[in-house]
Amino acid sequence: MKKILLFIICFANFLFAEPRLEFDQTALDEYVHSIDESFEYKLIKTISGEGYKTYIVDLTSQSYLTKNDIDRTEWKHWLIIVSPDVIKHQTGMLVIGAGDNDGKIPQGPDQLSVEYAKATNSVVASLGMVPNQPLTFSGESEPRWEDAIIAYTWDKYFTTGEDRWPLRMAMTKSAVAAMDAIQLIIEDMNGTKIEKFVVSGASKRGWTTWTTGGVDDRVEAIIPVVIDVLNLEPSFEHHWSAYGFWAPAIQDYVDMEIMDWWGTKEMESLFELVDPFNVKERYQMPKLLVNAAGDQFFIPTSSQFYFDELPGEKYLRYVPNADHNVAEGTDALQTILAFYASILNKVPRPEFSWELSEDGSIEVISKSQVKEVMMWSATNEKARDFRKDTIGNSWVAENLKQNEDGLYIARPSMPKEGWKAYFVEMTYETPFGLDLKLTTPVRVTPDTLPFEYKRPEKQKKGFLSNLN
């Protein structure tokens, strides 16, 4: 323990994180890479398991805001590191997770981290309490959680212009601090140097996965999960045009009247800070985007607003009959493990391409040997709404055969009423005994939007518009 505490003193002002100086630096870069005297970690417990050890770490990633703004400024996290007895890779995995700051010491690792670490002979760590929560802001009596915190901090940014406010800044810094701590602890405990990371997280943590990859050169690949919302403004407008309302899942943003800022200079300024699409040139690394076809937050056709413009190696996996809790009752975690193993072992990912034809069909051609190709489809006769909450487990699969031109063509029948959503799923075998499932984007027929989104007639005024 003394040796670990010595590292806290020595490295509080010398972290492994390196800014990506090949790009123009943003306020997010500056926030993440600024020295924070609060950074420290303490090894609370070491647990020996069959073929692995677990390190339970009390991590302080930073100080966020001031005591005049918020009830707790120090961000505390439980960082749980699973280290297999034999480490074969200098790349590890960081999973950014949620949780609340209840002070309870974790009793051990989650089973998934153990399985991933032992299956890949690599270090797998989970970072909790991203964001720290609940948080109570000055002038409010009730604590906020999750999206309610994000929405509040967006509103504060719109009115003040202070880039210390958006919660994504602190969430990103917490992930960077976790990578620092992992490197220090693993090298100290067994002499292994972890040089790179594959970063993953779901929902708000999926967004943080993007921003972490954008600011830290240690990130070798990213796996953002259920955050199908890059290029936010057209994505959200598409959301309303499909539903005619804002889905209940994003009510926290409605309550803070965030949508009334659409089209303003303040909203544009925020997107420059926190929307990965605005710095898409940074994402040359391999990317697996895992989304739920029945997500209650995001429209399944949202990838049309960003995917084609992303550079480098990129893959989609839309999971049928899944909602925002995409792992429940699905094989999504197997896809993530197969992709992670391919990065560790430098196994090339499958090569394939698709074309979204004018007649509504999806044409797929695969250079790599494919095990199975399926078209998944679901129909809603009443609305362009494919949330699992609305249609249940309505997605059905149909096997596709390769034609004489080497193409797999998905051409669903037009629904008698309503709308039909569909996509193509390719299953590839891997050397690891795991199937890797990848998909095309989701299409909808008829490709019509039942509602017309209109921006608020009276837009809000903030730190930029008030200057006029």
What are these regions (language model features)?
Residues 158-203, 219:
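Gly/Ser-rich "nucleophile elbow"/oxyanion-hole loop immediately N-terminal to the catalytic nucleophile
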Residues 211-260, 317-320, 326-331:
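Hydrolase active-site cap/lid region
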Residues 98-103, 114, 122-176, 229-242:
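Cap/lid segment of the alpha/beta-hydrolase catalytic domain
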Residues 416-431:
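Short, aromatic- and glycine-rich surface loops/edge beta-strands on solvent-exposed regions
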Residues 338-377, 393-406, 411-412:
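Surface beta-strand/loop "capping" patches
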Residues 18-89:
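Catalytic-loop region of hydrolases
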Residues 296-302, 328:
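Conserved alpha/beta-hydrolase "acid-adjacent" motif
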Residues 283, 289-291:
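Short beta-strand/loop motif that positions the catalytic acidic residue
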